[in-house]
Amino acid sequence: MQQPQNITTSSISNNNNNNTSLTLQQQQEQLQQLQIKRKRNLMKQLQHVSH
């Protein structure tokens, strides 16, 4: 009973590692996009306030 459990956990951990390594770049890209959106929103707010 213990052997299949070990196999499944190891496979799951491997999948998690693959997912994280794959999504690291995507997360960075999403962060950059979010920062750009925030900057644009800030600029819009500043323009509205100045006017």
Swiss-Prot record:
Residues 13-47 form a coiled coil. Keywords: Coiled coil. This is Putative uncharacterized protein DDB_G0277499. Residues 1-28 are annotated as: Disordered.
